């Protein structure tokens, strides 16, 4: 290694230290993500023939939204909002009153939560603006950890996965022809970024043109990729790619970055600040 290359590597290393990382993940958000993971695991176990897309990204001129889980089963579509709210839940005037008992102080704490039914209804409305196909969407709110639930409307909701999967199997509006599958195919699931530093994660949409790797005289595009793991060194990253067809690639990148769309805004994040990427496509 020449003296010029040595100082170049030193400079690159210090530049990498100051690169942008993904935002801090709150404990509440992390707790909710774990709940979604557990929910999807149970759904796949009880409905092995269903198709699932997580964290459907919706970006329209009228607003942005996200649907936690979209399930396709026997030509029926189910949009599911997952709420991992503990304690006692009471619907009141279009909102939810959440009361939790503090196990350390033995005191009750009250919090007003927005209606997940309204949240899901808005998301479905915007999704119909984004997707050109026409299909019936059955809406369901799933409460994962509540001790007691009091709801006085006719919206569909569940608090145990067994009743929910039974409902999906035996109920729900069926879409005409192949419309449900066509609609499902157009829905965009979020990509997932993860950083070991402070256990940070982000659901977003990676811009297609920022995730292309030239390897052995070919270009591996975002649409080809399933997952990416990144091993960090002082002046470069060892990027390990697993393609959808099972092929594995590895490439060293000095100071790479990706661009993502998150809630309608574009951000740049350095690969040196990421450890794992899961593509939702």
Regions found by a protein language model. Give the residues of each.
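Cell-envelope/extracellular polymer assembly enzymes that use nucleotide-activated donors
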Residues: 68
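Surface-exposed interaction regions that form or flank ligand-binding interfaces
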Residues: 1-65, 73-77, 88-91, 98-281
């Amino acid at each position: 290694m020449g003296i010029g290359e040595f100082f170049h590597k030193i400079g690159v290393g210090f530049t990498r230290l100051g690169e942008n990382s993904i935002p801090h993940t709150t404990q509440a958000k992390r707790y909710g993500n774990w709940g979604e993971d557990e929910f999807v695991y149970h759904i796949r176990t009880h409905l092995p023939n269903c198709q699932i897309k997580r964290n459907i990204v919706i970006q329209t001129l009228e607003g942005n939204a996200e649907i936690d889980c979209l399930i396709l089963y026997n030509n029926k579509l189910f949009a599911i909002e997952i709420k991992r709210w503990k304690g006692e839940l009471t619907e009141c005037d279009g909102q939810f009153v959440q009361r939790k008992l503090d196990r350390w102080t033995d005191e009750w704490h009250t919090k007003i939560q927005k209606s997940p039914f309204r949240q899901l209804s808005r998301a479905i409305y915007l999704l119909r603006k984004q997707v050109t196909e026409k299909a019936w969407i059955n809406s369901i709110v799933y409460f994962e950890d509540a001790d007691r639930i009091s709801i006085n409307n006719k919206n569909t909701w569940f608090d145990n996965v067994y009743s929910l999967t039974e409902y999906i199997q035996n109920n729900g509006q069926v879409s005409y022809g192949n419309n449900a599958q066509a609609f499902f195919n157009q829905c965009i699931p979020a990509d997932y970024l993860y950083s070991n530093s402070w256990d940070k994660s982000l659901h977003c949409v990676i811009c297609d043109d920022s995730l292309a790797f030239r390897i052995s005289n070919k270009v591996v595009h975002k649409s080809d990729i399933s997952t990416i793991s990144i091993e960090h060194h002082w002046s470069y990253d060892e990027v390990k790619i697993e393609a959808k067809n099972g092929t594995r690639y590895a490439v060293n990148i000095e100071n790479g970055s990706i661009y993502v769309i998150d809630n309608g805004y574009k951000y740049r994040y350095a690969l040196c600040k990421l450890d794992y990427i899961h593509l939702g496509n």
